[in-house]
């Protein structure tokens, strides 16, 4: 016998919360349709990229684009479940990645500076035991 888990016992990973997805999608159908259309375009574009065509300097642009798409999809998934606060937490790093990507596209010399900054950050962070 199947026992449907409830929000009271299993929170947002419950069967009941999954069923609530239809309610949110119906209530905000225009927004979800637009979000999915935008996501579809982004996924198709990134799918057209060929790793063999990406030289080392531009590889970071490819990776940042993937990170942006994944963050965008995470926001959609969280919003479907009515998890507004966690979705909002992802917006800032998504925007930071978008601004970084735009800056790197405009000035390819920033790619080297970006890697240098990442190296410095790793050196400063305390190492776990």
Predicted segments — roles?
Residues 44-59, 70, 77-129:
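Short non-catalytic regulatory patches outside canonical folded cores
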Residues 2-64, 69:
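N-terminal, Lys/Arg-enriched amphipathic/low-complexity engagement segments
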